[in-house]
Regions:
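C-terminal binding/interaction regions
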Residues: 2-34, 38-39, 57, 67, ...
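Short connector loops at helix/strand junctions that flank enzyme active sites
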Residues: 34, 47-49, 64-66, 81
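Short Gly/Pro-enriched turn/cap motifs at secondary-structure boundaries
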Residues: 40-45
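Short, thiol/selenol-centered motifs that function as redox-active sites or metal-ligating centers
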Residues: 46, 73-81, 120
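Short beta-strand elements
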Residues: 48-58
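Immediate flanking context of iron-sulfur cluster ligation sites
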Residues: 63-74, 111
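Alpha-helical support elements that line or immediately flank enzyme active sites
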Residues: 78-93
Length: 148
């Protein structure tokens, strides 16, 4: 079980049950061997760093599906929770649908975040987009949705 640091204990009351659950019991945490895409982002102000790893396969329709996703995050409870929830939100989606997951979707899925922690949802969405961009860059492809 992950222990709360002093700052997170005082913030516990402002975190939703979903945030606390994903912080204490993060899903899909850890690295990945030979990912198809990897995105790392950080915030120099708070020091949070997130890395998301993705695996992609084509389904019977020929659509590229995000079949596996995991994360490594160094940061506060909200950073860990947003990393955890975005892996659940993106897994099994087409790459285009995963690309459209925004920071607001992440925060909503967690039942909201304190205003001072919304930057964590930005990092999670940016890390996912970075991993997807890297996947297509390595394939030397640029689907139209990447422009959005």
């Amino acid at each position: 079980m992950v222990s709360l640091n002093k700052r997170d204990k005082s913030a516990k009351q402002s975190y939703t049950k979903q945030v606390m659950d994903h912080f204490i019991n993060p899903r899909n945490q850890g690295g990945m061997k030979n990912p198809d895409g990897k995105g790392t982002v950080g915030n120099p102000v708070c020091g949070d760093i997130m890395t998301l790893y993705i695996k992609v396969k084509k389904n019977k329709k020929g659509e590229e599906i995000l079949t596996d996703i995991c994360f490594e995050t160094l940061g506060c409870g909200a950073a860990i929770a947003t990393s955890s929830i975005i892996t659940e939100m993106a897994k099994g989606k087409t790459m285009e649908k995963a690309w459209k997951i925004s920071n607001l979707h992440v925060a909503d899925e967690l039942g909201g975040l304190p205003p001072q922690k919304m930057h964590c949802s930005n990092l999670a969405a940016s890390a996912l987009k970075s991993a997807i961009r890297k996947y297509y860059k390595d394939k030397k492809e640029k689907p139209a949705f990447l422009s959005e």
